Amino acid sequence: MINLPDVTLISVDTTDDLSGTLNGVYTSMSGINFGDVKLITTQEQIDNNPKLVEDGITMQTPVRDIKNYNDYNYYVVYHLHEHVDTSHCLLVQPDGFVLFPDKWDDAWLEYDYIGAPWAFVEDAYIDPFGRHWRVGNGGFS
């Protein structure tokens, strides 16, 4: 088992069906002891899933509404850090989670973000502050 006390495993899912997200969370937890594990979800899901707390998953509501894909993306970029108390976090999703924990490399902690770079496009990927974003597609950060 790998110990990563400075890494929070985190996921955001405000839908009615957490099964894919929980698969990603539990699969990621199977070979790694994270400093914290958090699921950002609705109050209804928190009320209906007390077993998750027993399994060591802290459940929190989002600090702003997430109603669609654009809200989700905005939330992850601008609000996810409000839920993280460790130096790093690993965001998992139903289609992106840890499969081979034995491949972990502590050198990854030297980077502030690991994700796929996007090509520069003059009129695209601009944040609300006018800055161009050139990375996306989730990753270890």
Question: Residue locations for each model-derived region?
Answer:
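Short glycine- and hydrophobic/aromatic-rich loop-to-beta-strand nucleating segment
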Residues: R134-S141
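Short, flexible, glycine/charge-rich loop motifs used to bind or transfer phosphoryl groups or to couple energy/partner
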Residues: T27-S28, Y78-L80, D102-D105, F129-G130
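Short His-Asn-centered micro-motif
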Residues: V12, I40-T42, V92-Q93, G115-P117, ...
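N-terminal anchoring/stem segment of glycosyltransferases
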Residues: M1-Y69, H79-H88
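Intrinsically disordered, low-complexity linker/assembly segments
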Residues: N73-V77
